[in-house]
């Protein structure tokens, strides 16, 4: 229980540090990421807008606290006078039980959690009484997962972010003009990382050599870069890593992507994971997505 005698001290300014999260990315050694109050506030309000989160909602925390502070929702839900139900460990049967018991309307989870939900046995599942809204992030999801989740009564939105940006900085916001597309095309679009998240100053796919945005042709690969108040203060006691990540006034994500003509961003790979064969850049993510659609792959 909390300390009844605790007295909150107002921060001296909004740039004062509020938390320290750790990330390793693909480079191995963990780096401390320093968050400030302003960025945490912007992420919280941005999520409420992007996800159309209502006041007094019941939220299921599935994302671990050590993953970007649970994607920032420990701040978002209190702001909305909501109730947080904490899942201590990934237990699919428990997820369905908690949704029913607490009338859960929203939760977030990585694609692997969604795979576990759609692969659950009949004894583990419970029929949903109403639509449950889900955010997925942490890894590019195979497009087929959206249809599988929809069949169970979930509505999934794909978002993208990093520990260094407090969480989400892109969202695959749905456009009504896509409603008439066939299911495969819809699911393909839902797997995109999307467009700029609310309260994010700017997110672009930029050629790291020229520092110019790539054309919106869905083919030219660049690096996702971010700027604004939702970028960390820096890496804790690591000026060299901070300066490298913030070169030219942008935070360099290390994720390679293209921009489609409609402005929606789609990740192709991590810069360290791209496969080069015969002079061509081959996306390991596209290979994984193709395999996931095969009927022999569960």
Regions inferred by a protein language model and the residue ranges of each:
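Conserved pre-ATP/AMP-binding loop-to-beta segment of ANL
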Residues: 2-22, 29, 52-58
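Conserved beta-loop-beta connector loops within the AMP-binding
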Residues: 196, 202-225, 261-262
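Gly/Ser/Thr-rich phosphate-binding loop
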Residues: 79, 101-109, 118-188, 201-202, ...
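Conserved AMP-binding/adenylation subdomain of ANL enzymes
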Residues: 41-58, 66-106, 120
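Active-site glycine-centered loops adjacent to acidic/histidine catalytic or metal-binding residues
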Residues: 138, 161, 194, 255, ...
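AMP-binding/adenylate-forming catalytic core of the ANL superfamily
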Residues: 107, 228, 233-234, 244, ...
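Conserved S/T- and glycine-rich ATP-binding loop of Class I adenylate-forming
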Residues: 17, 23-26, 59, 65, ...
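Conserved AMP-binding A3 loop
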Residues: 18-42
